[in-house]
């Protein structure tokens, strides 16, 4: 396994390009949207999992300082990998369940959605109640401004303590070149004065070099729910409820589909209502109340909110809206363009792909 990791790290650009190219080709597999063909979806899932694992290896590649990527040893960082693998497998589960069990496939889809919801809720808790990015597939490593300031103060106080504790007046900053050079000279003098130590000289030199090269890693403390509510009050509660609604919305949607059927307006309307309510709560947590109590979103979190609004377009692809409105518009556009060379052919293929994707819950679930 280590040899394979080394190969992926050395050829990361080639691996990423190949994964994107192969995943794109899977949409052109014959019988891609046939209810009885599990093979094409299995190939798609295998390539998806292969690409996901490779991306995970690349993201956790050792840095020049010897650290392992941004992931470190945080156990919560295994959750994004699990979510990505589940999303790669869910279409195979749907197709296989439909082939072998017919309408009972919804029981298996509910199971996969429940697993994703549980993992995402665990990730939401373990991340200190931060917004999930890309449904939890991208770690939210943006620090809260208050936490960053306190950690910077702790880091500065720790760096100011030299080998003689508070008596050390050589406040060298190890983050810049001059500070590293002065720290190295200080470390060299310290080594010369402690030659009688039981620790071998070569070991001491390595330890001092690591201390100079590597800035101190201050572990970020995860915020608890009680701390979120104490700090942000009602806004913190609105944010948490809004995020939980976003996480559980796909499970709620598929539960109502099993009860009322995919052609009923009830699941469609309830899903849209949950999305609207969740987004409204998140928006109110940002603007409502005192400024000190408002929830401030980072740049990636603002992008995530925009992404969530964009995927509302999937409601146009979900039944019964698709059958009653969207399909008619697609067929009308296809008829108007079918006589134009090349454009008519491309339009036909696009409509075919959209209608095929619409037939699979997992392609339009937005989960």
From Swiss-Prot:
What are the TM regions of this chain, as residue ranges? 237-257, 264-284
> Which InterPro entries does the UniProt record give?
Pex16
Which keywords, in A-to-Z order, does the entry hold?
Answer: Endoplasmic reticulum, Membrane, Peroxisome, Peroxisome biogenesis, Transmembrane, Transmembrane helix
Gene inactivation effect: Not viable shrunken seeds. Starch accumulation in mature embryos, cotyledon and hypocotyl cells. Developmental delay during early embryo morphogenesis.
Instruction: Give the UniProt tissue specificity note.
Output: Expressed in roots, siliques, seeds, cotyledons, leaves and flowers. Low expression in leaves and roots.
Q: How is it modified after translation?
A: The detection of an additional immunorelated polypeptide of 52 kDa suggests a post-translational modification of PEX16.
Predominant place of localization? membrane
One GO cellular component assignment for this chain's record is: endoplasmic reticulum membrane
Which residues lie in Polar residues bias regions? 147-159
Q: How does it sit in the membrane?
A: Multi-pass membrane protein
Segment forming the signal sequence = none
Name its GO BP terms in alphabetical order.
Answer: fatty acid biosynthetic process; peroxisome organization
The UniProt entry's coiled-coil ranges are: none
Q: What does this protein do?
A: Involved in the formation of peroxisomes, lipid bodies and protein bodies.
Query: PANTHER family under this entry?
Result: PEROXISOMAL MEMBRANE PROTEIN PEX16
Family of the protein in this entry: Belongs to the peroxin-16 family.
In its miscellaneous comment, the UniProt entry states: Travels from the cytosol to peroxisomes via the reticular and perinuclear endoplasmic reticulum (ER) and an ER-peroxisome intermediate compartment (ERPIC).
Domain comment? The internal domain (235-279) containing two internal membrane helices and the intervening residues that include the basic cluster VRS is sufficient for targeting recombinant proteins to endoplasmic reticulum and then to peroxisomes.
- What name does this protein carry? Peroxisome biogenesis protein 16
Q: Which organism is it from?
A: Arabidopsis thaliana
């Amino acid at each position: 396994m280590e040899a394979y990791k080394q190969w992926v790290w050395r050829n990361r650009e080639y691996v990423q390009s190949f994964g994107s190219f192969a995943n794109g080709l899977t949409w052109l597999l014959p019988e891609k949207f046939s209810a009885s063909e599990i093979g094409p979806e299995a190939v798609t899932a295998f390539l998806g999992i292969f690409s996901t694992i490779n991306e995970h290896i690349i993201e956790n590649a050792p840095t020049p300082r010897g650290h392992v990527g941004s992931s470190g040893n945080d156990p919560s960082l295994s959750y994004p990998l699990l979510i990505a693998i589940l999303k790669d497998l869910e279409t195979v589960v749907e197709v296989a369940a439909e082939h072998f069990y017919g309408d009972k496939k919804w029981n298996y889809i509910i199971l996969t959605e429940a697993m994703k919801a549980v993992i995402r809720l665990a990730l939401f808790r373990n991340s200190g109640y931060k917004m999930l990015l890309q449904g939890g597939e991208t770690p939210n490593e943006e620090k809260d401004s208050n936490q960053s300031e306190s950690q910077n103060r702790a880091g500065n106080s720790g760096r100011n303590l030299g080998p003689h504790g508070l008596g050390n007046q050589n406040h060298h900053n190890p983050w810049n070149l001059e500070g590293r050079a002065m720290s190295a000279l200080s470390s060299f003098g310290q080594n010369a004065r402690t030659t009688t130590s039981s620790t071998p000289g070569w070991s001491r030199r390595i330890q001092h070099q690591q201390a100079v090269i590597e800035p101190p890693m201050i572990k970020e403390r995860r915020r608890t729910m009680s701390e979120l509510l104490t700090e942000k009050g009602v806004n913190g509660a609105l944010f948490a409820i809004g995020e939980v609604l976003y996480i559980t919305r796909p499970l709620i949607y598929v539960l109502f589909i099993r009860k009322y059927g995919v052609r009923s307006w009830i699941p469609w309307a309830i899903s849209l209502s949950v999305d609207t309510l969740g987004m409204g709560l998140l928006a109110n947590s940002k603007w409502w109340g005192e400024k000190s109590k408002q929830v401030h979103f980072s740049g990636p979190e603002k992008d995530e909110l925009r992404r969530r609004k964009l995927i509302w377009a999937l409601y146009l692809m979900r039944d019964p809206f698709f059958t009653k409105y969207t399909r008619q518009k697609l067929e009308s556009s296809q008829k108007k363009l079918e006589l134009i060379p090349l454009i008519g052919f491309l339009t036909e293929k696009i409509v075919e792909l959209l209608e095929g994707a619409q037939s699979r819950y997992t392609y339009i679930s937005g989960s």
